[in-house]
Amino acid sequence: MQWWQILLIVLGSIAVLAVLTILLYKPVFKRFWDIVISFTGLLILWLPMLIIGIIIKADSKGPMLFKQKRLGKRKKQFTVLKFRSMCDHAYEKGGVATSEGDSRITKVGRFLRKTSIDEFPQLINILLGQMSIIGPRPILDWEYEEFADEKYEPRFKVRPGMFCTVDVKYRAEASRELQFQMDTDYAKHIKFSTDLKTFFGIIKTVLSGKSVYREENKNE
């Protein structure tokens, strides 16, 4: 087989995959790409993540990872994973609200939050099928109780995301109401183009250094 024939087969396969991804994104290929990206990400990042974990341990007492129960698809509870960015037992010392000057946030934690590197362990959640790369923000029980409303139910029919559409424009500046509304709108109209735009938008937002803090109910 000639090299150009191989090239045509490869390009044709890519074209077919691209078309199928666009046409069958929500029912099939969103999960397919979640698996591909999370598996590849963990394969590439396992050593840097291990080094980050060691640095976290050296910087302050406590575990490498922060674990917290969140509500996922169909309101099923799961344990979300993040690199620990606050001192151990931080919530016992000051509740869940944080601000930029919060003394509970470690030196390493400030950098992890600013760059969103603290979210990397969620690649494990994604590979396990508990989360998606892009989706509604995984919420706490009390948040659901506070904003329980039929109009927000569509957001619980899809997997929560490592990143969400709100992160692109507002990051931590959006109100809870706006967060829930945008998450619901996203869940109703999932498209490949939206996820792609959000993915690259997140990178731009992180590089811009937009605040990762808000005055009320900002969680680890």
Task: State each model region's role.
Residues 121-220:
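Hydrophobic structural segments characteristic of membrane proteins
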Residues 9-88, 192, 197-220:
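A hydrophobic, helix-centered structural microdomain
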Residues 65-104, 162-181:
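Short, glycine-rich, amphipathic interfacial segments at transmembrane boundaries or analogous
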Residues 1-11:
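Feature marks short, highly hydrophobic, charge-poor N-terminal signal-anchor/signal peptide-like helices
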